[in-house]
């Protein structure tokens, strides 16, 4: 895909490299083997510690690149949106993904960069100045969660990685995301302009959503990351009244507050979401912002954007008002260079959903709170938390009866415990614990949801053979046996 000559006329302080760098997996493998060989018999070769560190870094770099290739191969070969846009690649024939998927990322990035260059060339002096500020800005990347993801090291895993390790946690990745863009092997971050003295983070929501009470902030990008101007799946910018900093814009501007709500997309319609690799992302952001400013009828907003002395916080307000930047790192982030900032308290239910043991232990200090926690665990199908609480507290049948009577817990108000133990998302081991320890009656008829049914009826509806067999061995019968 040819990049138009117009790119050569963008005069910015940074040298924007748009050259198509080819990746040769065989060459990289040979280079790796050469570096690995240097550590063989190191005890007798007298190799310096610095040289060994270099070899270790080479291995880490190669592994990181290989993992990234797998994540992008999955995204570009499985996502139906890429297929409909003719931006897909073939799935790898073998077990391993080649580096072609990384080459493809660069090609896709150049494609979207070429589109916006053609649309915005030539630039005025004000536009070139704004673009140079953005290109030379440092970014902070913010991941929010109710989970405790760090001790001395921050470890954030993709949904696909979490699932492969059988870790149970509340997810923000839905079936539509997986089907259409298949980016469930990436870790997601909001993006902020740094170089300011304000309290971090500048933003606490993304696309109007509060993703958690803990903000984990890093100030370094990934050589294999990619950026979208919006949420990758939902590329509609919300109206100003849903914006976190709405008062800033409502108090200062008029026309632009009605212009901001829109789909951000490429030339092939609203499902065509621009993607930029790490190298191209600042240029992509800057040119798309200039395109929006040109279309705006709000003269005061335009003047504000082109202010020669615009400060980093104001620039961030603009960018995360016009867009909702989202950065993606393949599979997993592990770093000791981060900041953890507590934004608010975490509710007990949110701590349960996030499997935040530290927070749960701080909140659940007596049997009464344990009743609440167990109800939240069953209601959210959090078997790991349910089994943890059952092992920590000596629950009796009377405790379960008292738990069911709680009027300040939605799950106890709407469902019988027996229903929660046997519905389609329930866990067999939790059900087994309750019945084996005599905490519930196997044939108690539901009094709330699905009134008159029993646990066997629930299991039959979900066609869970393992649960059905266990219930039958313990004398379970259908509620129909009792009549209605």
UniProtKB/Swiss-Prot annotation:
EC number: 4.3.99.-
Database matches in InterPro entries: OspC1-4
Pfam families, per database record: Shigella_OspC
Compartments in which it is found: Secreted
Native source organism of the sequence: Shigella flexneri
GO CC annotations on file: extracellular region
Source superkingdom: Bacteria
Residue stretches spanning the membrane: none
The keyword Secreted appears for this protein: yes
Function comment: ADP-riboxanase effector that mediates arginine ADP-riboxanation of host caspases. ADP-riboxanation of host apoptotic caspases (CASP3 and CASP9) prevents their activation, thereby inhibiting host cell extrinsic and intrinsic apoptosis. Does not catalyze ADP-riboxanation of host CASP4/CASP11 or CASP8. In contrast to Ospc1 and OspC3, not able to inactivate host calmodulin.
Residues annotated for NAD(+) binding in this entry: 143-145, 149, 162, 172, 188, 206, 211, 231, 326
Catalytic activity entry: L-arginyl-[protein] + NAD(+) = ADP-riboxanated L-argininyl-[protein] + nicotinamide + NH4(+) + H(+)
Lineage: Bacteria, Pseudomonadati, Pseudomonadota, Gammaproteobacteria, Enterobacterales
Record protein name field: Arginine ADP-riboxanase OspC2
GO-annotated molecular function: ADP-riboxanase activity; toxin activity
Record's keyword terms, sorted: ANK repeat, Lyase, NAD, Plasmid, Repeat, Secreted, Toxin, Virulence
Residue spans of the ANK repeats: 414-444, 451-480
Family under the similarity heading: Belongs to the OspC family.
UniProt site positions, description: Important for catalytic activity: 143, 188, 211, 231
